[in-house]
Structure formats: C-alpha cells, structure tokens
Amino acid sequence: MMLQRCLDLLAPALQEPGAVVVDCTLGLGGHSEALLERFPEARLVALDRDKEALRLSGERLAPYGGRATLVHAVYDELPDVLDRLGVPRVQGVLFDLGVSSMQLDEADRGFAYAQDAPLDMRMDQSTGMSAAEVLNTYPPGELVRILRAYGEEKQAKRIVSAVVREREKEPFTNSARLVELIRAALPQAAKRTGGNPAKRTFQALRIEVNGELSVLERAIPAAVESVAVGGRIAVLSYHSLEDRLVKQVFAAGAANTAPPGLPVVPEQYAPRLKLLTRGAELPTEEEIAENRRAAPARLRGAERIRESLG
C-alpha cells in the first residue's frame, strides 16, 4: 500500500553504501523485500512481534543473506534492538501500522469480522490477553471507554450493555456471536453508515489487546531519536488515532521552540525535523481499486535535520 511513495520518500537517505534501514512492521516481508531490492547497498533490520510472520518472511528474504536481520520485537523496543546489534544510528525507518494481510486472512486469528473465528486478535499469540478475555472480564465502564477512545464508536454504551448481558449467560469465544450482537444492538440509522457495524468495535478490541497506541506513542519518538541527521522516517497509518499521534510527534519535532522575541534562535530551540509530506498523503484511486484495504491509509514523512541537544 503506497509502497512506491514510501520508497521514494526514504530514497535520498539510503543511497550510501552501508546505510541501515529499519522496517518496524515486517509482516510478510513485502516492504522489506522492496527496500532490499531498491537499495542494493543498504542493510535491513526488520521487527515483528508475530513469530509466524518472522518465519514466513525469513524464507522470503533468505536470498538477501546477511543484508537482512530479522528480530522478534515490538517496535517500541527499537532502541534496545539497535543497541544489541551495535547500530548507533540508522538512515531510514519505515512503519506500516495496522494488521498485516496475513493476520486478516488467517481465520483462526480473529481479527476479521467477516468470518467466524476464535476471538483472539493478539499479534504475538505467545503473550497477553485475548480479545475474548477483554470482553468477558473488563468492567462495563472500561469497555465503554475502549470502544469510544479506540473505535470512536458513538454507540459504545448500547453495545457494552448487550455484551455484559450476554457474557453473563455464556462467555464470548467466537467472533460471529459478537458481530450478531452488535448488529442487533445498534439502531437502524447507525447501521447505514460506513461498512460493517462491527468494524469499530473490532478495531477498538485489537488496539486494546495489542496496546497499539501506547506502543506507538513510545515508538515514534524512539524512531526519530534513532535516525541520524539526514536520515528519514516514513509512517503509514490506517485510522485517525494513529495518524493524529504521528502528526503530533512530527509537528513537535519540526517546531521552533524558542521563546518569542529572541533576535537569534539558539540551536537547542531550532527544529529537529523537516516535514516531507504536506499533511498526510492519501492513496490514489488506482491503489484503492487494486487493494481496498489501502483506502484509509495516511502517509507522513520527516527528515532529521539536527541532533538533539541537552
């Protein structure tokens, strides 16, 4: 999704032999493969919390040998990963946020509301609470907060009332029952807007289960710090909460923070980042026609223009 634009955005920073680029969201390795192909002198470090994704992408990237280093890690662990690898600074960082197509297409992971599956939704299935556990154990007020904050679901109270009523009869295990419950709970008018009525609830549960926003909140500033001066970072996000967070970090880095009235701006107040996109760039109609999952994508890019001081 918008891969070509991401590569073009990172290109000026990845021409030098030995440049290091980080793919923070490896998935099935499509972006990593494209980075290795496009920048034959670059080395790749790629992260994923999903062990199955690492196995499959490892096979895909095997022809690139020692140029690719794959690491089982969450992307907010980037500073630790680079430290372990002895890489002080990198020249490029790419994030493609959201669920990989593999996770969406694998029925037994429970990410998709279009097919019945166990309510799991963990990107790393070896750790943490599943979506079913969240639904069955969280207090009603907490569930309402999650649906509102992470799903921007206006009918959160109505949905949670139905969930609490149903879970007392029998705990939730599968996605189809939840989808049906949401359909039944929503007023007719709410069902007419924006696709499957379960979409927002599933998004909210996925974000909660994987701690996505809190991880991202730590990951983007950490990625900015790991980029050398002249290095670049590109972020593809898929909903407004992610995009807003990326926008805030980039805008803060690109701001002049000097107190008003100074005749000369000392370096510690000067911007650390230069924005590379005007607002968020959207996918083209062709990209959406080719892959409908690209429709909500938003791309932002920034270049590191000075070191942090003090």
UniProtKB/Swiss-Prot annotation:
GO annotation, biological process: rRNA base methylation
EC number: 2.1.1.199
Catalytic reactions on record: cytidine(1402) in 16S rRNA + S-adenosyl-L-methionine = N(4)-methylcytidine(1402) in 16S rRNA + S-adenosyl-L-homocysteine + H(+)
Assigned GO CC terms: cytoplasm
Positions that bind S-adenosyl-L-methionine: G29, G30, H31, D48, Y75, D96, Q103
Compartment(s): Cytoplasm
Keyword Cytoplasm: yes
MF annotations from Gene Ontology: rRNA (cytosine-N4-)-methyltransferase activity
Pfam families: Methyltransf_5
Superkingdom field: Bacteria
Assigned keywords, A-Z: Cytoplasm, Methyltransferase, rRNA processing, S-adenosyl-L-methionine, Transferase
Family according to the record: Belongs to the methyltransferase superfamily. RsmH family.
Function noted in UniProt: Specifically methylates the N4 position of cytidine in position 1402 (C1402) of 16S rRNA.
The name this protein goes by in its record: Ribosomal RNA small subunit methyltransferase H
Taxonomic lineage from the root: Bacteria, Bacillati, Actinomycetota, Actinomycetes, Kitasatosporales
